[in-house]
Curated annotation (Swiss-Prot):
Protein name in the entry: Homeobox protein GBX-1
Tissue spec: Expressed in CNS including rhombomeres 3 and 5, optic vesicles, and the medial ganglionic eminence.
Segments of the chain annotated as binding DNA: 316-375
Domain of life: Eukaryota
Source organism of this protein record: Mus musculus
Lineage: Eukaryota, Metazoa, Chordata, Craniata, Vertebrata
Length: 418
């Protein structure tokens, strides 16, 4: 391997690595060992590239994985300690592979407790975030025994890293400029008291490393809660349904709303308004054959359109799907025949009504929920008064009727004036 990394330690196992380092500092960086604790320097020099390239990938990996192969170190002292000797950590990275490995380095967490002062640990992460391609290729190269364990960790880290930059809040929460104190605390607690002890004795073997790797790679996953909120595109199941549930059937019914108003179906509209606000799809309330209800209910559905309700992520939810009265009529007929659809039936209905299969599926889900509520007796029979809760709900039709009502008022006023 390159001479400067290996020459300083001729004897087989003279001293523990940290003492050996202070005794024989590396020729090209004549500074004492404590230097590894200096923040900027330690951070700016990736331990991975230094170790991996100077010691040569073969020997370093062999040593870290095997933990004991005495001869495998190519002349430097055998055994596990040699891979982590501080001279290899401090020396400037060799020009050829330094950059490539460096981008991968921050994600290479197992060594964080070893190399960096706790306070600075999180700081390297932002530096490594943008260039992901090298990291991916790096992950490809980790197939040897050395990183068998890490290999599985890396892809998830890649995923995390890709997601991290687009957060709205976290960068500050995670590593803000005043990160040092908080980060020191969190990292210390995260990687348990051990790493402090482990840092004092430079000798680690792979068995020790693996727990560290698990420890240090586990903490990052807290972000995922944000993902489904920040990126609604991610399929967080509950969310998809809820938003679709709220978004099902409405404004298309609005025109129907006006005619329903003229029909003056007071009890009906009140009931189905309550239902739809309770989250049901509010198609027909009682026995289906009474088809008059389906245009009406479209409208009543239109009334509780989600007005600026915000999801946890802070985005206002998308508008509810507008079903036309014809679509509602067909869906009701289908539901009357069959409460549960097969996949083929669902795709046929969706195709016939020019809806997506998801819309049909969710309409049926909501309709079944309402049907079960009715069966359970929550809803009074269609003819009876709404016994459930005598709360008076006046559905305000959203769209045309505003103008109609206004003109009626004007006419009444004009009629009242003379």
């Amino acid at each position: 391997m390159s001479p400067e990394g290996d020459t300083p330690n001729p004897p087989a196992r003279p001293l523990p690595p940290y003492e050996r380092e202070s005794a024989a500092p590396e020729p090209h960086c004549a500074e004492p060992a404590p230097r590894r604790h200096l923040g900027p320097r330690a951070r700016s020099e990736p331990c991975v590239s230094a170790r991996g390239a100077r010691r040569g990938p073969g020997s370093a990996m062999q040593r870290a994985a095997g933990g004991g192969a005495p001869g495998g170190s190519g002349g430097s002292s055998g055994g596990p300690g040699a891979a982590f000797s501080i001279d290899s950590l401090i020396g400037p990275p060799p020009p050829r592979s330094g950059h490539l490995l460096y981008t991968g380095y921050p994600m290479f967490m197992p060594y964080r407790p070893l190399v960096l002062p706790q306070a600075l640990a999180p700081a390297p992460l932002p530096a490594g975030l943008p260039p992901l391609a090298p990291l991916a290729s790096f992950a490809g190269r980790l197939s040897n025994t050395f990183c068998a364990g890490l290999g599985q960790a890396v892809p998830s880290m890649v995923a995390l890293t890709t997601a991290l930059p687009s957060f709205a809040e976290p960068p500050d929460a995670y590593y803000g400029p005043p990160e040092l104190a908080a980060a020191a605390a969190s990292t210390a607690s995260r990687s348990n008291p051990e790493p402090a002890a482990r840092r004092t004795d430079g000798a680690l073997d792979a068995e020790e490393l693996l727990p560290a790797r698990e420890k240090v790679t586990e903490p990052p996953p807290p972000p995922p809660p944000h993902f489904s909120e920040t990126f609604p595109s991610l399929p967080a199941e509950g969310k998809v349904y809820s938003s679709d549930e709220e978004k099902l059937e409405p404004p298309a019914g609005d025109p129907a709303g006006s005619e329903q108003e003229e029909e003056g179906s007071g009890g009906d509209s009140e009931d189905s308004f309550l239902d739809s606000s309770a989250g049901g799809p509010g198609a027909l309330l009682g026995p289906k054959p009474k088809l008059k209800g389906s245009p009406g209910t479209g409208a009543e559905e239109g009334t509780p359109v989600a007005t600026g309700v915000t999801t946890p992520g802070g985005k206002s939810r998308r508008r509810r799907t507008a079903f036309t009265s014809e679509q509602l009529l067909e869906l009701e007929k289908e539901f009357h025949c069959k409460k549960y659809l097969s996949l083929t039936e669902r795709s046929q209905i969706a195709h016939a009504l020019k809806l997506s299969e998801v819309q049909v599926k969710i309409w049926f889900q909501n309709r079944r929920a309402k049907w079960k509520r009715i069966k359970a007796g929550n809803v009074s029979s269609r003819s009876g008064e709404p016994v459930r809760n005598p709360k008076i709900v006046v559905p305000i039709p959203v769209h045309v009727n505003r103008f109609a009502v206004r003109s009626q008022h004007q006419q009444m006023e004009q009629g009242a004036r003379p």
